[in-house]
A protein has these predicted regions:
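N-terminal Sec-pathway targeting helices
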Residues: 2-15, 27
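Glycan-recognition patch characteristic of GH18 chitinases/ENGases
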Residues: 27-148
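Hydrophobic faces of well-ordered beta-strands that scaffold small-molecule active sites
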Residues: 56-58, 79-83, 114-118, 166-168, ...
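Substrate-binding surface in catalytic domains of secreted glycosidases
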Residues: 59, 90-98, 176, 181-288
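Short, acidic/polar
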Residues: 62-75, 144-159, 206-213, 321-332
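Catalytic domains of carbohydrate-active enzymes, especially glycoside hydrolases
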Residues: 67-90, 154-166, 332-340
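Glycan-binding loop/region signatures in secreted carbohydrate-active enzymes
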Residues: 123-136, 264-329
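Active-site groove signature of glycoside hydrolases
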Residues: 150-180, 228
């Protein structure tokens, strides 16, 4: 065989190798582009979830942070997430739970606004907790100097971590009008400082807030909790329904400015021995599988419910929300032109 012929064959083989290599490389790169980074939520919009909502807000909680899949499914519909929650120690210092701090560090780059929620819970060094403590509010809000210090502490914390906004969720004030007066002064003063520091402010209100006796001012976004219709304090039933939400929307008409209405995920499991525990949609579905039973849907609320007897021969009644329930509850809010908030992420399947 001549040298020229060898050269032609070598050149031909080289061209074939280059062509095959380029095809293989293209396929590898294509495959790699479809692999999600473990620290980055996909930004693909899922139009099957809450099709009428493009401005959904929600919460994540420090004791249940297995929520990346839910964020991924809701995706661009999520305009903001509140990180729940900062509490107080026995010295009235603001404390960020370690797990929440770690999750925030992981999700700083995610494409939604990030609020930090502050609650009036006290967690002592000995582990004893005082939930929704009214006394600490009296201490923090009783006079201008105390409010100023508390506001400065909040602003410093938010700026240190780089949150986009503040959410205040101080509860169990009930009919204490003197405390409400100081609380509203605090909200107004905090809003002014938040504006100065280019921060947003949300204020969460309970359904029993005596709105007709109070003078809220325009500025913050006010979020009404549209749940606790049934719970550990009551007989079995839905956590919310459209009539209940309509009542709260009517009540909130006296509050000026932007408003959002929060609907609940999950539900409760009532035992006939008197005890009750909260359940997520995923937990309720697991009970159905284990007991080989099916849930029924309540016509009025669109909640799912079922009964079962456990291994200890104790009877249970379970009511919980799924995607159908949440979309049904949100519809009445959307029709009035308000924003929807979802309490909370964690244990939701979002599968009709």
């Amino acid at each position: 065989m001549s040298i020229k012929k060898y050269k032609r064959e070598f050149i031909l083989i080289g061209i074939i190798i280059l062509l095959v290599g380029s095809v293989l490389l293209k396929n590898v790169l294509k495959k790699d582009s479809n692999i999600e980074s473990p620290n980055k939520i996909s930004q693909k919009k899922n139009n099957d979830i809450f099709p009428d909502i493009d401005n959904l807000t929600s919460w994540i909680v420090y004791w249940d942070l297995n929520v990346d899949n839910e964020i991924n499914m809701l995706n661009k519909k999520l305009s903001s997430i509140s990180y729940f929650a900062v509490n107080f120690n026995q010295n009235n210092d603001l404390i960020v739970p370690e797990k929440l701090e770690m999750y925030y560090d992981k999700t700083k780059s995610y494409n939604y606004e990030k609020y930090i929620t502050i609650v009036n819970d006290i967690v002592n060094d000995d582990g004893i907790s005082l939930l929704k403590d009214k006394e600490i509010l009296n201490i923090l809000l009783s006079d201008e100097l105390s409010r100023e210090k508390h506001i400065n502490d909040i602003i410093d914390l938010v700026k240190e971590y780089g949150f986009d906004g503040i959410e205040i969720d101080y509860e169990q004030i009930k009919d204490d009008l003197a405390l409400w007066e100081n609380y509203i002064l605090f909200i107004n003063e905090l809003y002014s400082e938040a504006l100065t520091n280019n921060l947003k402010l949300r204020v969460v209100l309970e359904g029993n807030t005596p709105i007709d006796k109070l003078n809220f001012t325009e500025g913050p976004t006010y979020v009404m909790m549209c749940y606790n219709l049934h719970g550990s304090f009551s007989e079995a039933g839905e956590k919310s329904n459209q009539d209940f939400i309509k009542e709260l929307m009517d009540k909130m008409k006296e509050v000026p400015g932007e408003k959002s209405f929060a609907i609940p995920t999950g539900g409760f499991d009532w035992k006939d021995n008197g005890s009750t525990k909260s359940v997520s949609e995923a937990e309720a579905e697991q009970i159905l599988i284990e007991n080989k039973i099916e849930a029924k849907r309540d016509d009025k609320s669109q909640y799912l419910y079922f009964n079962y007897t456990d291994k200890e021969n104790i009877k249970h009644e379970v009511w919980y929300a799924d995607q159908v329930t949440l979309e049904y509850l949100s519809q009445v809010i959307i029709e009035e032109g308000y924003d929807v908030s979802l309490w909370r992420l964690g244990g939701n399947l979002f599968s009709k």
